[in-house]
Design a protein with these regions (language model features):
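Active-site helix/loop of acyl-thioester processing domains in fatty-acid/polyketide metabolism
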Residues: 24, 51-75
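Hydrophobic beta-strand-centered segment that forms part of the acyl-chain substrate-binding groove
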Residues: 2, 65-104
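Hydrophobic core residues within well-ordered beta-strands of beta-rich domains
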Residues: 18-20, 101, 115
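Short aromatic-glycine motifs in intrinsically disordered, low-complexity regions
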Residues: 5-15
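Beta-strand residues in well-ordered beta-sheet regions across diverse protein folds
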Residues: 35, 104, 118-120
Length: 140
């Protein structure tokens, strides 16, 4: 199932202007493939380029999308998540406005509500960024 535009809000708790995922190509309990088309008015664009904080937020929201997919299939609202650790981030390039990013996030492990994920951000065939992120989801 593909989620676009406002359908994204069924998977992530973020709302404009901080939404950094505009399409979810696929998602399950283990991984997600997401996308973002970088607009000129994006708050993380400077001098025509999408900067590192935006890439990190995009990765975090991509991870939230696959966590949100689990709540979606159970008929629940997406949970608020908090980043606990970011490590091994490599930024190979800063994508320009108009770029269509495609990101794959993969669950490595989950223990007690804490998730560890690997992420790869691509622009066509170019590897834009990689990152390992640990986050936890707030229980209601």
């Amino acid at each position: 199932m593909i989620f676009r535009d406002k359908e994204i809000f069924m998977l992530i708790p973020q709302r404009p202007p901080i939404v950094m995922v505009d399409v979810v190509w696929s998602a399950d309990e283990q991984s997600a493939d997401t996308g973002l088309t970088i607009q000129e008015d994006n708050i993380f664009v400077k001098d025509g380029l999408f900067r590192e904080p935006g890439l990190i937020e995009h990765i975090a929201q991509s991870a939230a999308a696959f966590a949100g997919y689990g709540t979606f299939v159970r008929g629940e609202e997406p949970k608020l998540g908090f980043i606990g650790e970011i490590k091994d981030c490599v930024f190979n390039l800063m994508p320009p406005v108009g770029s269509e990013l495609r990101t794959h996030t993969q669950l490595v492990t989950e223990i007690g509500g804490i998730r560890l994920i690997n992420a790869e951000v691509r622009l066509k065939d170019e590897l834009v960024a990689t990152c390992v992120m640990k986050f936890f989801l707030k229980d209601d």
